[in-house]
Regions:
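Conserved functional hotspots at enzyme active or ligand-binding sites that engage polyanionic ligands
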Residues: 1-93
């Protein structure tokens, strides 16, 4: 999973959609914040340079055709699994 910065938006975002830049050029992202309380949907994540808490319940669809963005980092496989499980848990009931 890639960590990106989106033009005109503060902070970092974690791309949680499977195909980051597929034919639709859209991505589902979750914001990353530096400080908030931890709970099952707020998961710590870090790359080589970026560290924060992913707010899994705040997913957004972003059309990257109309927004500037840049890739800044990536997270490990184990972090990816934890975040994917949390997001999947939102929809399992």
């Amino acid at each position: 999973m890639e960590i990106i910065q989106i033009e005109k938006l503060k902070g970092y975002f974690l791309v949680v959609s499977k195909d980051f830049f597929n034919s639709t050029e859209q991505a589902i992202v979750c914001p990353m914040v530096k400080d908030t309380f931890l709970d099952p949907l707020h998961i710590e994540a870090s790359g080589k340079e970026v560290k924060g808490i992913v707010m899994c319940e705040q997913m957004r669809l972003v059309d990257l055709r109309y927004r500037g963005f840049k890739r800044v980092d990536a997270i490990s496989y184990s972090q990816r699994i934890n975040i994917t499980d949390a997001i999947q848990g939102i929809f399992d009931y």
